[in-house]
Amino acid sequence: YSDMLTQMQSTDAIAHLRWATEELAVCIPNTHPFVKKSSMGEIAFIHNGGVARGDSLNALIDADYQAELEGDTDSEQYFAALLTQLRKSDGDLVAAYQALVKDFAPINYTSINAMILTETELVIVCQHKPENRSPELQPDYYDLFWQSIEGVTSAWSSGVRPNPNNFNELKNGSLLRINRKTGDVTTHEIG
């Protein structure tokens, strides 16, 4: 990981550093970020949380995206459901998430927190069900925070507090958009 960081030449990146889910194989097809072509161009996606896999989740995924699934994770299936909803929403990410949150409501999930990197923006999604959080996790485990300092905007979840005196909480049920060219930041309600 550190070797890759020292060689990377990019203005934007997303990283998902965590322990692997116990029952799933540790292999490239199960590794974040997931990257696909979409109506928005190339899109990269990482997810922190758990979504019950099964018929309810599969019903939200178009057949072509279902056929492209490579791994076994709920995260990849959630991403395919997002891509399906993006298609239905003509690439409007806010509208796609507003619909997706409604579609996910009857599905058992802890969190559909995500970071999404497109050709034009970085998007951070905060949507979780505190009542479904495992008791061994800290109460703020799925809470998300962000800050902008000297033109650099960063976002993080549990355990990371780069500057405890200068950060904003991203409200549960909201989405943060960062324009990659201008650095402009906007928030939107999604749930």
What are these regions (language model features)?
Residues Y1-G191:
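N-terminal segments that mediate ammonia production and transfer
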